[in-house]
From Swiss-Prot:
Gene3D superfamilies in alphabetical order: Zn(2)-C6 fungal-type DNA-binding domain (4.10.240.10)
This protein's encoding gene: asR4
Record's note on what induces expression: Expression is significantly up-regulated under xenovulene A producing condition.
Stated name of the protein: Transcription factor asR4
SS bonds (residue pairs): none
Listed Low complexity bias regions: 112-129
Residues within the DNA-binding region(s): 26-52
InterPro entries: Zn2-C6_fun-type_DNA-bd_sf, Zn2Cys6_DnaBD
GO cellular component, one term: nucleus
SUPFAM superfamilies from the UniProt entry: Zn2/Cys6 DNA-binding domain
Length: 632
């Protein structure tokens, strides 16, 4: 600050203020002699990138050559290092940049061209940045599109895989359905000898189980299997026609599958079947039925059957049939039977039967046939279960469940409920159509009657399978210890699947002891009641179709079901029976000693089920012989 001068302001002294005012123009504009618009920094310095600095007004200049270039550069580096870019006034130091020193004396024309070039460069840079951003945005869009395309391709591949899986599942379901129609009983009975005690005694003529189920199949129509179980070829439809005793004409779909080296010739098997109606009566003790026995010189039983215990082996282009017999406790029963005459059916008619009710001229096709055919297959699966596959947790000596177990009986009756009910409805509908045709004097064709006879044969076959299972189960329970091993029931008593292995639960609580036994008794009683009611339906059809009494007919009691018993209630309608079947035998059949099959039955309490099997034997014989059954 300047020193005070005396003699002023009345006090003899005066002070001076510091001159801190800045110039109106910055140093760059001042040197270039252009109008400075003002501001810190000014627009011109901002565009040119020069440091804008305002000098103090009325400042004395320094002499030329006081500072050399090295000093200026050092000061410039010092000012840059200290960050002196605020533009504030520092009186002790005046810093100039290299650009300010270089442009200390610019020409007016050059400064204006620089001012015009800087905005153009800035605009170009902005355009370039925008173009780069657009390119990046386009690249991102392309990447997103590629990702979307990849996702769509993956979805299409997944859909194709799902469709392939669905097709594979459908094929498996179709194969399972076809395999389900072919029960394991076919392969079991055709590849293995008779292993159960049921049909092991079928060779003996004193057993109610002597008639083969194959004889019932012999009366079925040729096109029955194709009409009742889709038009596709199944293993069931391939085996059953081969077991028929008469040659048949296969459809084209079947012939194409049978024309190979190992084709089975049904005509060759038919030569092994013979029929005979000669029989002679024989008598037995009072505890059993007195039924006629066949003449061994004139009667020849078929050597194979579909559901019997026959052992059939196949070779290329030929078929050989042989029957293997085994010891059975059924042989001890001394229940004789009569020979069965097999009547081959006539060729099937080519006329199609309508599915809807016509104007009272043609009888519609029986609708209960598919259910009865499926029921026979299911019952045979229960009687002949497939052998279990040995796993790590099982022992090789473990045997499958017995075909005459309590579980199989109860499950078989449960499976038969719906088909039997459908058969009853079919009987009622057929009777109504017959009465309607009689009122309007219309004639029913033979095709409808054949379908009814086929359904009735399958119905009788299902009853016979269940009754024979019950009969064998009761016999098996009466045998213990050495008798079981002697008659090939198993190596130990544990092989018999008795009531102890059946689990009974109510509301999630398992029952045991006497309560469990009572519940099992009730279930078995109901099962036997349903089977007896089904047999009664068959006998009612046979009784209504009987003609006037002859020398070979007698009054037979109409059987009713009460508390699981097969009882006689009234003497009604004539029923043709053999001469040797006495009323005492029927009385024994209808006796009250019908205890349940739950382990306490004695050997002498088996006449009831055996008698029902005998009655069923003669009823099915009438079916095979072509007897007319009343469907009203």
């Amino acid at each position: 600050m300047p020193a005070s001068l005396p003699g002023q302001d009345g006090g003899g002294t005066r002070t001076t203020r510091p001159r801190s005012q800045l110039r109106a123009a910055c140093d760059s504009c001042n040197k270039s002699k252009t109008k400075c618009p003002g501001g810190n920094p000014c627009p011109l310095c901002q565009c040119s990138g020069i440091r804008c600095h305002y000098s103090v007004a009325h400042q004395l200049g320094r002499p030329k050559g006081s500072k050399n270039k090295r000093t200026l550069m050092r000061e410039m580096q010092g000012s840059l290092g200290n960050g002196d870019a605020s533009g504030q006034f520092q009186p002790n130091r005046i810093v100039t940049t290299a650009q300010a020193h270089i442009s200390s004396n610019p020409s007016p024309v050059g400064s204006q061209s620089q001012q015009q070039q800087h905005p153009q460069q800035a605009g170009q840079q902005q355009q370039q940045q925008q173009q780069q951003q657009q390119q990046q945005h386009q690249q991102q869009q392309q990447q997103q599109q590629q990702q979307q395309q990849q996702q769509q391709q993956q979805q299409q591949q997944q859909q194709q895989q799902q469709q392939q899986q669905q097709q594979h599942q459908q094929q498996q379901q179709q194969q399972q359905q076809q395999q389900h129609l072919l029960p394991h009983a076919f392969s079991n009975t055709m590849q293995n000898a008779g292993t159960t005690a049921a049909y092991a005694g079928a060779e003996k003529e004193d057993s109610p189980l002597a008639m083969d189920d194959g004889e019932l199949f012999s009366m079925l129509d040729q096109t029955l299997l194709m009409d009742t179980m889709t038009d596709e070829m199944s293993d069931f439809g391939q085996l059953v026609p081969q077991a028929l005793p008469h040659p048949m004409t296969m459809p084209e779909s079947l012939t194409s599958l049978l024309n190979h080296d190992t084709a089975f010739d049904a005509t060759q098997l038919s030569n092994e079947y013979s029929t005979s109606s000669n029989s002679k009566p024989s008598t037995t003790d009072d505890s059993c039925m007195a039924l006629p026995t066949p003449d061994s010189s004139t009667t020849h039983r078929p050597s194979s059957s579909v559901f019997g215990d026959g052992h059939i082996t196949f070779s290329s282009g030929t078929a050989s049939a042989s029957r293997t017999s085994a010891s059975s406790i059924v042989e001890q029963q001394s229940i004789p039977t009569s020979p069965v005459t097999v009547a081959p059916m006539s060729p099937a008619k080519s006329s199609s039967v309508p599915r809807t009710l016509p104007p009272a001229t043609v009888t519609p096709t029986c609708t209960c046939l598919p259910g009865l055919v499926t029921l026979i297959c299911q019952l045979e699966d229960l009687r002949h279960p497939p052998p279990p596959r040995h796993t790590s947790g099982q022992h090789p000596h473990q045997h499958p469940a017995s075909p005459y177990s309590l579980k199989c009986i109860l499950q078989g009756v449960q499976l038969a409920e719906e088909p039997w009910a459908g058969f009853a409805r079919c009987l009622d509908a057929a009777g109504a159509r017959k009465r309607h045709g009689a009122q309007e004097n219309t004639v029913q064709d033979d095709d409808g009657n054949d379908h009814h006879r086929h359904a009735l044969a399958l119905y009788a076959m299902s009853i016979r399978i269940i009754l024979s299972s019950i009969h064998k189960y009761r016999i098996a329970l009466s045998m213990t210890g050495q008798q079981q091993r002697q008659h090939n029931f198993g190596d130990s008593p544990e092989d018999l699947d008795d009531a102890a292995s059946v689990l009974v639960s109510v509301g999630g609580v398992q029952l045991a002891g006497e309560t469990k036994s009572e519940m099992i008794k009730i279930a078995v009683r109901l099962a036997l009641k349903q089977t007896t009611a089904a047999l009664m339906r068959l006998l009612e059809c046979r009784n209504r179709s009987s003609s006037a009494p002859s020398s070979a007919t007698m009054q037979v009691a109409e059987y009713s079901v009460g508390h699981g018993r097969f009882e006689s209630t009234a003497m009604v309608r004539d029923h043709p029976l053999p001469h040797s079947m006495s009323y005492s035998s029927l009385k024994t059949l209808a006796g009250p000693h019908t205890n349940m099959i739950t382990g306490q039955d004695q050997l002498e309490k088996r006449e009831n089920v055996a008698g029902m099997l005998s009655i069923l034997q003669y009823t099915t014989k009438d079916l095979i012989d072509g007897a007319n059954f009343d469907w009203r």
